[in-house]
Structure formats: C-alpha cells, structure tokens
Amino acid sequence: MPVLLTRDLGVTLADGERRFTLRVPELALEPGEAAGLTGASGTGKTMLLELLGLLRRPEAGGRLLVGTGAEARDLVPLWSARGGRSRLAAARGRLFGFVPQSGGLMPFLTVAQNVALGQRISGSEDAARAAALIARLGLGPVAGLRPDRLSIGQRQRVSIARALAHGPRIVIADEPTAALDPEAAAEAMALLIGTAAATGAAVLVSSHDHDLLDRFALTRHRLVPEARDGHVVSTLRTGAEAAA
C-alpha cells in the first residue's frame, strides 16, 4: 500500500512566450521502497521533488496523497485552504525528510545538534533515536564537531542522519552524491537506502548517475520532455515506460 500516491499532479511556469509544464500522471512509493528519478538537465527533476515535498504549489485538480490506508490524506487542497500554509509546513516537517546536494547543514551547530534539528522542528525530539543514527552512520567520533571540520562525505552522512532522525514517512534526496567521488557516492547511497529501509521510510533519489542507481536496483522513474511550439512539457514516466 503506497505511502505516497499522486494523480495528475502538475505545474506550469511562464517566461514571456515560453512555458514549461511538469506533468506527473501517477507516482506511487511504497514504505521502505527506494526509487530513482532521472532525466536530462532542465527536465524539472528538482521541481518535481519540490512538488512532492510540499515546497511548490501544484495546479488545482491534481492529488497528492500521503499516508497509508485510512490515514492517507490529499494535501493539495491545503494550498488554497484557510490556514493551509501552516498546516502544510507542519506536514512537511513531520512527514518528509530532505537530503540536499550540498548537505544544507547549519554551520554554527555541531553534528549532533544538526541531526537533532529536524526533531526539534517537527516537535518529535528523541535523543536515543538521534544517537542511534549517529552511531549507525559512523559519526560518533565527530559528533561534537561543526560542519567545517568534516569531509564532504561526512557532511552528507550528517545530512542523511538529520533527514531520518524525526521518523519521516518519505525521504527526498536531490542529487545527494553529485559532489562525491565514486567510492564515497556508493557509500553514501548504501547508507541512505539501508538506513531508510530500516526505518520503513520510502526514498526518492534524483540522480544523473544511472550506473549508481542500477547498482542499488532502485525503481526507476524518468522525466521525458517534449517541445510543442515553444512550450516544453516534461512528463514523468514510470515502470516500463521509464526504461524505454
């Protein structure tokens, strides 16, 4: 049973006579599933992650259901509901974890404080869970250091721990290994997927590294653009369509 399900989700951006439309006919993520998002530069991968993560407003008419069974809720109507923005922010902080390309760590906080930050924001502080993630990701020896004392690979591991510390249902990772060498990229991907699976969170990873996605057997989704008289429409293809 999916923890995230979309139906006809989309958004259009206009710049003079030029328009770009992102279309997501359907996307389903199961609890514990690891999925990869691919597509050429400019096809809207980051925009899609923003839509799913409640960071960008979709067009009316689409659906974005988060949760399983009877607890599943369509979050699209909150964009236009009274008080909806605060409810969206609360849902985003509670249901989603984010791993950005750069790590996105607070430079004035230690590793342990950065990991606990998501818990504080979502109101779900759990020191034991944060400590367990720090240990699992091999960050114990550097837990008291600030990000400027860490390697790039260590910073990404901190970002992974922070994204999972509050127990999100879905983790969204935007090119999380782009700044890493192949060995460090494989290590970070293994830690992200393995740790998320252990917590039951679904993971969607945007990446240009097809070989890395194949190595970890991620379910593949692909954005395919089509130009129509100055209007580019980028559509998400899933399953067999994504492999075509």
PLM features: what roles do these ranges have?
Residues 160:
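Hydrophobic anchor residue at the start of the ABC signature
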Residues 167:
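Conserved catalytic motifs of ABC-family nucleotide-binding domains
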Residues 109-116:
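Short coil-to-helix segment of the ABC ATPase nucleotide-binding domain corresponding to the Q-loop/switch region
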